[in-house]
Amino acid sequence: MEIIMQTAQYIIELLKAVFLGIVEGITEWLPISSTGHLILVNEFLNLRQSKDFIDMFNIVMHLGAILAVMVIYFKRLNPFQPGKTAREVQLTWKLWLKVVIACIPSAFFGLLLDDWMEAHLSNFFVVAIMLVVYGIAFIWIEDRNRRVDPKVTDLARMSYKTAFYIGLFQVLSIIPGTSRSGATILGGIIVGTSRSVAADFTFFLGIPTMFGYSGLKAVKYFIDGNTLTGGQAAILLVASVTAFLVSLFVIRFLMNYIKKHDFTVFGKYRIVLGIIVLFYGAVKLIFG
């Protein structure tokens, strides 16, 4: 009977991992904050695992979502793709150089502030404030953007300086509730790129950023003396695979969506969610 109960509990853990993977796959690419959603979802659907594992899980799971970008854009991102002309190969290498340049600010500040941010800012109130602030920012920027023609409508024409500026906006995403994609897309629009260019560059920028951040979290996890059981590895794998599959659909949806729409609806969603998170955090603080 005990074995049956343990098996049932483990199956429930795997189902939770599937749900968390779905949340990650949706929220990683839409500018609505994957970390903010995972913090909220974990309150109601918490894995029966150690805090250290959950903290690592919430970050390393991003690799599944990032892998979806590599699959969808493989030909475009691969400088060794058969059939590419010398000009196309050159543009691909230049694209990667822009991505590397854009990663520099977040790599520096991420390493410097990661532990402090996790200790002091991973709470409901910070997440709620960031959701609302960036929600308002999206609505305001999109309203202003209707009267301004983008200066950069082709990623190949984006300068290295513009890439660096977008990288500076990515630094803001180390604050929980901001949204990495939200910060970089908003930054791209502010510095003069079209929505599609900002979204594309956001996807590409996520590859080294999230691989690096996930690697850092995994290393810290093991340095702190933690181990990874077979059951935990399976939970992480299930969530990552789910995030990968969902991301394949979400990325394509977003790229089709922004051809005819702006990001205002996501701004409104962030404001509503931020108010809900703030209310929940206040209730939890008062009543425990």
From Swiss-Prot:
First-tier enzyme category under EC: hydrolase
GO BP field: cell wall organization; peptidoglycan biosynthetic process; regulation of cell shape; response to antibiotic
This protein's record includes keyword S-adenosyl-L-methionine: no
InterPro entries associated with the record: UppP (IPR003824)
Catalytic activity: di-trans,octa-cis-undecaprenyl diphosphate + H2O = di-trans,octa-cis-undecaprenyl phosphate + phosphate + H(+)
Membrane-traversing stretches: 25-45, 53-73, 93-113, 121-141, 171-191, 196-216, 231-251, 263-283
PANTHER family noted in UniProt: UNDECAPRENYL-DIPHOSPHATASE
Identification of the protein by name: Undecaprenyl-diphosphatase
